[in-house]
Amino acid sequence: MSKRHSQKYKIDRRMGENLWGRPKSPVNSRSYGPGQHGQRRKTKMSDFGLQLMAKQKLKGYYGNITEKQFRRTYDEASRRKGNTAELLIGLLESRLDAIVYRCKFVPTVFASRQFVNHGHVKVNGIKVNIPSYRCKPGDVIEVRERSRSMALVLEALDSPERDLPEYIDLDAKAMKATFVRMPEFSEVPYAVQMEPNLVIEFYSS
């Protein structure tokens, strides 16, 4: 198993949930955490523990992004007018690597980060190699022509594992998508329950 796959499944085991709904996730066959103490009976979590778990789960889902990046996203959401939890999710979903993953150009969010890093993606006709790049409504995201025949891309597009959300308009044949609008939390096709309100409580306490 590659280091990247190992990291992904370690997050699943730590959270005790199949974060991305992947059929090969180890939690499909066992429900305890990683390591030699993973099978110990879990005690009831404190409010802080639940808040921390919610934060770690959301960070993990988006490719285990750094605390610095995640906190910066929260700070931006809290400065904007509106529901901070909804805004946090909208900002996370507008990341370029998240949109590339939603479009099924790649099989995992980890692969999406690497795919963007390696220069395989254009935004509005310009190559962008920053996974955390913030897309705006109306932006056109596409796989570069030279990268469209990659087995990774073709296999991911054929996968039935994920549904395309309504806030992304995809032309799968052209490998091009438009980020239509910022999503509402209820629209995001998470495979598990996310609790952004607990994340807000974590940073607000």
Curated annotation (Swiss-Prot):
Task: Report the SUPFAM superfamilies cross-referenced here.
Answer: Alpha-L RNA-binding motif
Stretches for region Disordered: 1-44
Q: Reply yes or no: does the keyword Glycosyltransferase apply.
A: no
What does the entry give for GO biological process? Answer: ribosomal small subunit biogenesis; translation
Database matches in Gene3D superfamilies = Ribosomal Protein S4 Delta 41, Chain A, domain 1, RNA-binding S4 domain
Source superkingdom: Bacteria
What GO molecular function annotations does the UniProt record carry, in alphabetical order? rRNA binding; structural constituent of ribosome
- Keyword annotations from UniProtKB, A to Z: Ribonucleoprotein, Ribosomal protein, RNA-binding, rRNA-binding
| InterPro entries registered for this protein in UniProt | Ribosomal_uS4 (IPR022801), Ribosomal_uS4_bac-type (IPR005709), Ribosomal_uS4_CS (IPR018079), Ribosomal_uS4_N (IPR001912), S4_RNA-bd (IPR002942), S4_RNA-bd_sf (IPR036986)
PANTHER family linked to this entry = 30S 40S RIBOSOMAL PROTEIN (PTHR11831), SMALL RIBOSOMAL SUBUNIT PROTEIN US4M (PTHR11831:SF4)
Report quaternary structure and partners.
Answer: Part of the 30S ribosomal subunit. Contacts protein S5. The interaction surface between S4 and S5 is involved in control of translational fidelity.
Family note: Belongs to the universal ribosomal protein uS4 family.
- Which HAMAP family does the record cross-reference, listed alphabetically? Ribosomal_uS4_B
What protein name is recorded for this chain? Small ribosomal subunit protein uS4
Gene behind the chain: rpsD
